[in-house]
């Protein structure tokens, strides 16, 4: 299955070449979910899905969500193009780390694009408490030290931001000097943030984003005393251009 934001549909393709499509458009989540599951059944794919959205308080299960919602094709296309541009920089940043690192991936619950580096050292149990997200999953995800960065499109009064945090937060991390100048520490979020607008309007957006990713990682790794010589590698000049 894949989301096609050129034709604005969901493609379901099997290894035998059978193909089904479900249009992306205005409507209810319940109807969309029902259409996707019906197409899967027609292909002989019987799958169980946990239908309550994760990381969202007071979430409505997909099949019960009958609120009509709009679909702005132009806004979706712009958002997708932005994510593709960010992914390129995130992957370049990821390539200079030889330790364990997540892929550049998208979290549907919090709706953020992220990449996470691991030091290899254990971390204290995560406190959990994320809405509609099992505590044991949070504890497993944060069982080892991480430095994580990503992009969040905002919501609930917050503008779009790039973010960077460390778990557990090492002493002094929040006082580190990071780049670019528009980057600041947020006590509310417990992480460094950089307004999306600061990157979008920069003379060199790629360089501005890379400066944020690298400087916040440097701050986390130094404060937590990661074995940086073992975990990092230098990219050839042509790979960084």
Residue ranges of predicted features:
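Short glycine-rich, low-complexity/disordered patches
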Residues: 44-56, 95-109, 222-238
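Glycine-rich, often proline-containing surface loops adjacent to acidic residues and nearby aromatics
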Residues: 8-21, 54-74, 162-163, 188-197
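Low-complexity, glycine/alanine/valine/leucine- and proline-rich hydrophobic stretches
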Residues: 143-193
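Secondary-structure boundary elements
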Residues: 38-49, 84-100, 171-173
């Amino acid at each position: 299955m894949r989301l096609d934001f050129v034709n604005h549909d969901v493609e379901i393709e099997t290894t035998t070449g059978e193909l089904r499509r479900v249009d992306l458009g205005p409507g209810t989540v319940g109807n969309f979910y029902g259409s996707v599951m019906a197409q899967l059944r027609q292909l002989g794919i019987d799958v169980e899905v946990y239908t309550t959205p994760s990381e969202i308080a007071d979430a409505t299960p997909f099949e019960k969500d009958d609120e009509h919602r709009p679909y702005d094709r132009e806004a979706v296309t712009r958002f997708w193009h932005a994510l593709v541009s960010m992914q390129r920089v995130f992957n370049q940043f990821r390539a200079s780390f030889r330790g364990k690192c997540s892929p550049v991936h998208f979290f549907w619950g919090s709706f953020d694009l992220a990449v996470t580096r691991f030091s290899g050292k254990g971390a204290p149990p995560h406190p959990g408490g994320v809405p509609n997200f099992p505590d044991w999953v949070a504890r497993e995800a944060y069982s080892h030290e991480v430095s994580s960065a990503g992009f969040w499109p905002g919501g609930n009064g917050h503008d779009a931001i790039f973010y960077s945090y460390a778990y557990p937060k090492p002493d002094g991390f929040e006082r580190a000097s990071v780049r670019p100048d528009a980057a600041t520490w947020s006590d509310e979020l417990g992480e460094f943030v950089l307004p999306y607008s600061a990157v979008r309007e920069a003379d060199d957006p790629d360089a501005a984003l890379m400066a944020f990713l690298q400087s916040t990682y440097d701050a986390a790794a130094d404060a937590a005393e990661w074995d940086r010589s073992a975990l990092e590698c230098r990219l050839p000049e042509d790979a960084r251009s």
